């Protein structure tokens, strides 16, 4: 199996968590796209979806799947999304696709968060993948200086604006040994909308696609 096939295998395993009558939270990115495409086959069984990005909403609608506003949908039973990294505690780095704030909101509003990924995403310590931080534009330089004090090297994601109209700083070379504390600290910086550490609300289940099949943690 190549990496894309591993992602699809993880997405197929996540479909098993979808029950009739659910409103399903749906993430963003290449692995989540596999889940969306598979969800199309059972779209008549669910009551709708909540998307974590405009891109995912468009893909869902392209399959004829209803997309609802989270404020209307209320508490969700299930959220399925990918990750850029996960540790053994199911703390994640997310936001490579730029949808981290909406992803974090939908995850917080969901009873169960099933994370799907290929096996390369499981790491001992978070931080090899550059950590995305969504920032209000006027605070970009200030937040970058503060992130540098933490030992990271923040780089503006050039030519990219989030669905919320903000910018992203990708922070390189951070060793995130305490994800919960780091998430809290960065989120406290004025001008930060959210950081792409998902530790205070980690995944409940991690499904990894591998050459040998599926592995579940949690």
From Swiss-Prot:
It comes from Thioalkalivibrio sulfidiphilus (strain HL-EbGR7). This is Ribose-5-phosphate isomerase A. Pathway: Carbohydrate degradation; pentose phosphate pathway; D-ribose 5-phosphate from D-ribulose 5-phosphate (non-oxidative stage): step 1/1. Substrate binds at residues 28-31, 81-84, 94-97, 121. One of its GO terms (biological process) is D-ribose metabolic process. The gene is rpiA. The lineage of its organism: Bacteria, Pseudomonadati, Pseudomonadota, Gammaproteobacteria, Chromatiales. Catalyzes the reversible conversion of ribose-5-phosphate to ribulose 5-phosphate. It is an enzyme of class 5 (isomerase). InterPro entries: NagB/RpiA_transferase-like (IPR037171), Ribose5P_isomerase_typA_subgr (IPR020672), Ribose5P_isomerase_type_A (IPR004788).
């Amino acid at each position: 199996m190549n990496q894309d096939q591993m992602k699809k295998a993880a997405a197929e395993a996540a479909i098993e968590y979808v029950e009739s009558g659910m409103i399903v939270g749906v993430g963003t990115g290449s692995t989540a796209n596999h889940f969306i495409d598979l969800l199309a086959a059972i779209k008549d069984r669910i009551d709708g979806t909540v998307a974590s990005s405009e891109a995912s909403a468009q893909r869902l609608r392209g399959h004829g799947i209803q997309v609802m506003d989270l404020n209307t949908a209320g508490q969700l039973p299930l959220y399925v999304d990918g990750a850029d990294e996960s540790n053994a505690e199911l703390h994640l780095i997310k936001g490579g696709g730029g949808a981290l704030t909406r992803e974090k909101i939908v995850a917080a509003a969901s009873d169960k968060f099933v994370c799907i990924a290929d096996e390369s995403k499981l790491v001992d310590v978070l931080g090899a993948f550059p950590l995305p931080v969504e920032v209000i534009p006027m605070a970009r330089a200030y937040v970058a200086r503060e992130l540098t004090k933490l030992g990271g090297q923040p780089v503006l994601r050039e030519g990219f604006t989030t669905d919320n109209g903000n910018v992203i700083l990708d922070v390189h070379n951070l060793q995130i040994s305490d994800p919960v504390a780091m998430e809290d600290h960065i989120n406290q910086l004025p001008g930060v909308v959210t950081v792409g550490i998902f530790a205070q609300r980690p995944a409940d289940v991690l499904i990894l696609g591998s050459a040998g099949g599926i592995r579940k943690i949690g």
